[in-house]
Curated annotation (Swiss-Prot):
Coiled-coil segments on the chain, per record: none
Known function: Catalyzes the reductive methylation of 2'-deoxyuridine-5'-monophosphate (dUMP) to 2'-deoxythymidine-5'-monophosphate (dTMP) while utilizing 5,10-methylenetetrahydrofolate (mTHF) as the methyl donor, and NADPH and FADH(2) as the reductant.
Gene name for this UniProt entry: thyX
Protein name per the record: Flavin-dependent thymidylate synthase
This protein's UniProt keywords: FAD, Flavoprotein, Methyltransferase, NADP, Nucleotide biosynthesis, Transferase
Family: Belongs to the thymidylate synthase ThyX family.
């Protein structure tokens, strides 16, 4: 039977629908469903106009205008649903974005698989001395990184062994020892390390997805969540290319400047030599402003 649809479809997204996109060692992202495209945003903004009533360059210009001026509602007309497999410690950071609908694999009802994340040696670094929430840019020496990986792997395997022992069940749920009594899955799971993988379905509208990507695809974001965001950016580019171009122009590669920062720029344009001491800005504000201008 030939399936037809009257809904808008995006060929580039249809090609990757349901296909797992590998992330990290055992993780993936799959696009499960979506609604809308660039034209849906334009149509919502114009309300009374249907698809195709304006030239493409006018549609693109309108999307640029909407994003540039923070008119968010039209972007909420597009939705996308993902199936994502990710380490638990990243899931806990990810779930802080509360504007999505989420349904996670339940370790109360099912037994988690024996898959855990181990970082590449190049991504193992010490704590940053200036940023309390991230690692330094330089990797640790090879022998130190290897020791770290050995500890992480040993702990994960030992905890999973205890997990099965506590439940008295293997990965498939088969009883290990007929003469022993296991505890409930909802209790046994507490002993697993946070680098074990979980899965969830994550549905979100385009506006909130762009907000998520602006934060999580940023160079300051943790590497392990940033790589997921970078894959999602590629998906957004395939799904809504006009929106992606505007997002890249005004959010990813653009910059917000404070009133004081704008005043500094005006003074510099007028030929004044402005320093941190004469800028009325904090040291951090000044450094961030100077970074914008290279």
């Amino acid at each position: 039977m030939h399936n037809t649809t009257k809904r808008v479809t995006v060929p580039a997204l249809e090609e990757i629908l349901y296909e797992p996109i590998k992330v990290l060692d055992y993780g993936f992202i799959r696009v499960i469903d979506y609604m809308g495209d660039d034209s849906a945003i334009v149509q919502a903004a114009r309300v009374s106009y249907g698809k195709g009533t304006k030239q493409l360059n006018q549609d693109k210009g309108l999307i640029n205008y909407l994003l540039r001026h923070y008119h968010t509602t039209p972007f909420e007309m597009c939705d996308i649903k993902f199936h994502i497999k990710l380490p638990i410690f990243i899931a806990r950071q990810w779930i802080r974005h509360r504007t999505a609908s989420v349904n996670e694999y339940s370790a109360r009802y099912s037994i988690l698989g024996n898959e855990f994340y181990l970082p590449e040696p190049a991504n193992i670094a010490s704590q940053s001395a200036v940023n309390k929430q991230c690692r330094e840019g330089d990797s640790l020496p090879k022998e130190v990184a290897e020791k770290v990986l050995a500890i992480l792997e040993e702990d994960a395997r030992q905890c999973y062994g205890h997990y099965k022992e506590l439940m008295n069940a293997d990965e498939e749920g088969n009883i290990i020892d007929e003469n022993a009594t296991g505890i409930a899955r909802e209790l046994a799971r507490m002993n697993l390390t946070l680098n074990y993988y979980t899965e969830w379905y994550w549905k979100i509208n385009l506006h909130n997805l762009l907000h998520f990507l602006r934060l999580r695809a940023d160079p300051h974001a943790q590497y392990e969540i940033r790589v997921y965001a970078e894959k999602m950016l590629e998906i957004v580019k395939a799904w809504v290319p006009f929106v992606y171009e505007a997002f890249e122009e005004y959010r990813l590669q653009g910059a917000n400047i404070s009133r004081k920062g704008l005043d500094v720029i005006k003074r510099m344009i007028n030929g004044e030599k402005v320093t941190h001491e004469t800028s009325d800005m904090t040291k951090r504000e000044w450094e961030e402003l100077m970074k914008i201008f290279g």
